[in-house]
Amino acid sequence: MPRQFSLENTRNIGIMAHIDAGKTTTTERILFYTGRVHKIGETHEGSATMDWMEQEQERGITITSAATTAQWKGTRINIIDTPGHVDFTVEVERSLRVLDGAVAVFCAKGGVEPQSETVWRQADKYKVPRMAYVNKMDIMGADFFNCIKMMKERLQANPVPIQLPIGKEDNFQGIIDLIEMKAYYYMDDLGKVIEQRDIPEDMRELAEEYRTNLLENVAEYDEELMMKYLEGEEITEAEIKAALRKGTIAVKAIPVLCGSSYKNKGVQRLLDAIVDYMPSPVDIEAIKGVSVDGETEIERHASDDEPFSALAFKIMSDPYVGKLCFFRVYSGKLSSGSYVLNATKGKRERIGRLLMMHANHREEVDMVYAGDIAAAVGLKETTTGDTLCDEANPVILESMNFPEPVIHVAIEPKTKAGQEKMALALQKLAEEDPTFRTYTDQETGQTIIAGMGELHLEIIVDRLLREFKVEANVGNPQVAYKETIRKSVKSEGKYIRQSGGKGQYGHCWIEIEPKERGTGYEFVNKIVGGVIPKEYIPAVDAGIQSAMNNGVLAGYPVVDVKVTLYDGSYHEVDSSEMAFKVAASMAFKEGMKKADPVILEPIMKVVVTVPEDYMGDVIGDLNSRRGRIEGMEARAGAQVIHAYVPLAEMFGYATALRSRSQGRGVFSMEISHFEEVPKNIQEQIISGRAKNNSSDE
């Protein structure tokens, strides 16, 4: 199948916004006008095409970024819908990574809300060209000009309005196009009948002022235009558009449009602007990668003639075709049925079917080209962030970094029969989502799930029930403590049972010493002259390790100790591996009690970004959580606080930060190291553990 749209006529864009700015509704309207959906879906009716997971339709928020292909005026537009909730930042990160440009949707009333700041900073990180669409111009309190002001102040952006609204709230009737200097009025409900008129008299002056602002702005991106402007010559529409496109792609200007997606006003203009100002794959820098040995940097240009390279950015389980792998083609072309190399894993993969995705149906294609976003069926080894490439020309593209999970809870199926089903389901979900982990707790034997926040884990539990029919009980979030010692001791362990028949005899002397934090366990055998025969030495080591699984203070695993076996005795008949294992275990337990044992807790490295006004409050709160502030730095209208805080004190922090910063603060945390717990808290942990154990019995 030959290429339908040239690379120049391809746009890969994301639609990003705060929850409730009307992002999904805007995407729905785009699909309606580009002819892909016959009946418009409404989010609040729960029928929106892009929100295809059941929980999304119930909660009215977008969780998984669905990729959709649409066409407008001879251009193919691939749209990635991204979620706006802070627990799903990984979805936003991974979609920004494969886009060429983004449309930021703002609510005309709320303006730049906290999540918009977060997403904006993520887009800054990847240098993604953006345009802005001020939505909901028809609602009470809508204020286009305040929204522009907030973009300057909160995002340190350079917004360039190319439209002005005519009227607002109930009286929102249409827009003034500042490039054509004409007014457009919407005459019907579906926004298909539009009347062009002259700019109304009462808005003439304002339009002239914003037109001047627009010309001054675009003149900066084109020297010829600058000369024309300074000499007062006429500047054509085509010249303005070309210069603004240049500024947008260089991430220096943000074209701003307005409308009301729900009332079908302004969406076709938005589509025109996507074609006019958003980059094609050819406009952005060639993607960089490295050779498989990591030695040489390799570039791949957006061209069908270069060797094939693509990045897998999302894995999904599909009820009809199994595992779907979404990928962005950066160079070359790929046909279904062919073999590719997964360079990240060093594995060969066969591409089964190739699908172009509409939000809820799919179209099978036999070939995809540079710049396309598609999904493949049949990939066994590939996970999020992997590079797929031509076997003869391997390359590893820059992958995505995913944060470590910050919260974990125990989970168990409601029925014994559900155990295996649950394990399989959790494994599938972990394949789809790199920030979700599942493992078994060695001490309690419980299954633990870990993720980016409470909503994240709630949705996982919800999906277990809906998609995999597994009912599960979930515990409270827990901290994984450890135990260690502070001084060296010598200790004896004797296990002797000799009362008729085969006896038991094991006897050893060990020295236990503290080691540096994070260096683990070390066993040294210093037995000379065979006082303990060689074959029993591994049993002594095993006995010590089994005793280390449960420390003497509160039963947490023991870490960072060195144990030296230096003396003992044995009995020719009664000694056995079992006897030495028990003796060593007894020696360790007795010795640890005398070695000044302490509990260690995980310390998190916490980074909080808040607007300056809330800084004092946030720092005070971190201090009250036993936090150590390590430093601060100013960043685009906000302060970034670096601190170390015990994990035990961080539960419920997302909610606390939200209320202390009126929802404008964001934070990330990852494990840094383990540290001794203060004495008073150690006592609380020990008594809490004792209570739990007695209630379990």
UniProtKB/Swiss-Prot annotation:
Q: Which PANTHER family match?
A: RIBOSOME-RELEASING FACTOR 2, MITOCHONDRIAL, TRANSLATION ELONGATION FACTOR G-RELATED
Into which family does the record put it?
Belongs to the TRAFAC class translation factor GTPase superfamily. Classic translation factor GTPase family. EF-G/EF-2 subfamily.
Its function, per the record, reads:
Catalyzes the GTP-dependent ribosomal translocation step during translation elongation. During this step, the ribosome changes from the pre-translocational (PRE) to the post-translocational (POST) state as the newly formed A-site-bound peptidyl-tRNA and P-site-bound deacylated tRNA move to the P and E sites, respectively. Catalyzes the coordinated movement of the two tRNA molecules, the mRNA and conformational changes in the ribosome.
Could you tell me the keywords of this UniProt record?
Cytoplasm, Elongation factor, GTP-binding, Nucleotide-binding, Protein biosynthesis
SUPFAM superfamilies, alphabetically?
EF-G C-terminal domain-like (SSF54980), P-loop containing nucleoside triphosphate hydrolases (SSF52540), Ribosomal protein S5 domain 2-like (SSF54211), Translation proteins (SSF50447)
An annotated GO BP: ribosome disassembly
Q: Which NCBIfam families match?
A: EF-G (TIGR00484), PRK12740.1-3 (NF009379), PRK12740.1-5 (NF009381), PRK13351.1-1 (NF009891), small_GTP (TIGR00231)
Q: Name one GO cellular component term.
A: cytoplasm
Q: Which GO terms describe its molecular function?
A: GTP binding; GTPase activity; translation elongation factor activity
Q: tr-type G domain spans which residues?
A: 8-282
Its protein name is Elongation factor G
The residues that the entry says bind GTP are 17-24, 81-85, 135-138
One Pfam match, given by its short name, reads: GTP_EFTU
Its subcellular locations are: Cytoplasm
Q: Which PROSITE patterns does UniProt cross-reference here?
A: G_TR_1, G_TR_2
